[in-house]
Amino acid sequence: MSDNDTIVAQATPPGRGGVGILRISGFKAREVAETVLGKLPKPRYADYLPFKDADGSVLDQGIALWFPGPNSFTGEDVLELQGHGGPVILDLLLKRILTIPGLRIARPGEFSERAFLNDKLDLAQAEAIADLIDASSEQAARSALNSLQGAFSARVNHLVEALTHLRIYVEAAIDFPDEEIDFLSDGKIEAQLNDVIADLDAVRAEARQGSLLREGMKVVIAGRPNAGKSSLLNALAGREAAIVTDIAGTTRDVLREHIHIDGMPLHIIDTAGLREASDEVERIGIERAWQEIEQADRVLFMVDGTTTDAVDPAEIWPEFIARLPAKLPITVVRNKADITGETLGMSEVNGHALIRLSAKTGEGVDVLRNHLKQSMGFDTNMEGGFLARRRHLQALEQAAEHLQQGKAQLLGAWAGELLAEELRLAQQNLSEITGEFTSDDLLGRIFSSFCIGK
């Protein structure tokens, strides 16, 4: 297998459909056109032609599109054959194309990878293609499209350019120490560095919003049996996702629901009631519940308001609180307010949010929705926002750390050489986002998660 091979793959989802598309990219795409179509179509024009087998019989007929490189998605010669979407027809056409020497099936994401390697896209834009396909809401799709059009990359490139100018200034100060003006201590470098840090902080804030929009928040509902966990899951989901009975231990496995709150993806997980297991099946369910709790972004500690007047989680169930991960945020949810007559709404107890509601009637559930949105700092007015991945956040955080360390070196010891090194490392972190500086292993992991025909 060679990166110089001509590749082919189905660009439409498998299964039956009105249209099925095969995409070919590479130097032999021209030969495929002449062999299967009998001619080379006019560049960038839709040509209605028969698709022929080796013996001249017609396999299908449809639209052929010819994009000579470098003016194509991949930067190579690209041919698209748009025929009928029957799997048998597409398979016959694919087999016909693969009889031509030098062609092979594309790896997942290989078309996008070639576009990146041929400078048609940077890495953040290439990732945005997969994010656009996987978008689960209108807002996520719009933000992914912004990233694909270069909004995120432009912000990162602006930071890289600013760091380049700053590095030049710092290197000049190091190389010419005998000048009358001490460039390291005259305040100009510090001012420029502060500007870059402020710009980076703004991009980090937007990237966190973009990551929330892409990744969502994982919320686990946990508590004792019959506290109303499944009823709350149903209330948040807006449908009967979980079976609800008065029998303790009805939920024995993990139940998952994916919803949106004003565009923010929310992964709600209902777990088995936590208690001493009565049998092996329940024991496994409780074990899985704890696994989900340990991986959660937030835990909704569900309390049956008819069983206790306490509101402090450490008082209600100290053993449960003691077992939770140290920095895991907790929201105490006192359920069954329709029975206890408690005042609906949100308050605070010992640093934890406390919400009183009725999962059965739905009263107070909107308060919980707003709380979840606010607790993650999600901004519903993300005009012009972009999507971000965890690796992007890590690169931005590392760049910010290097800039802060560089500032400390500048102000503490006027150490120009150390500042210059921190600036270089910050620039390297930012360049990883767009792929200007990255490893082959990282590229392999990113593009292998794409669709075959992308």
UniProtKB/Swiss-Prot annotation:
Q: Does the keyword section mention Metal-binding?
A: yes
Enumerate the subcellular locations listed in this protein's record, separating them with semicolons: Cytoplasm
Report the superkingdom from the record: Bacteria
Q: Which GO terms describe its cellular component?
A: cytosol
InterPro entries, alphabetically?
G_TrmE, GTP-bd, GTP-bd_TrmE_N, GTPase_MnmE, MnmE_dom2, MnmE_helical, P-loop_NTPase, Small_GTP-bd
Give the cofactor binding note: Binds 1 potassium ion per subunit.
Binding residues for (6S)-5-formyl-5,6,7,8-tetrahydrofolate: R23, E80, K120, K454
Q: Which residues bind Mg(2+)?
A: S230, T251
- Where are its TM segments located? none
Q: Which GO terms describe its molecular function?
A: GTP binding; GTPase activity; metal ion binding
Q: Hey, which family's this protein in?
A: Belongs to the TRAFAC class TrmE-Era-EngA-EngB-Septin-like GTPase superfamily. TrmE GTPase family.
Query: What is the name of the protein in this document?
Result: tRNA modification GTPase MnmE
Gene encoding the protein: mnmE
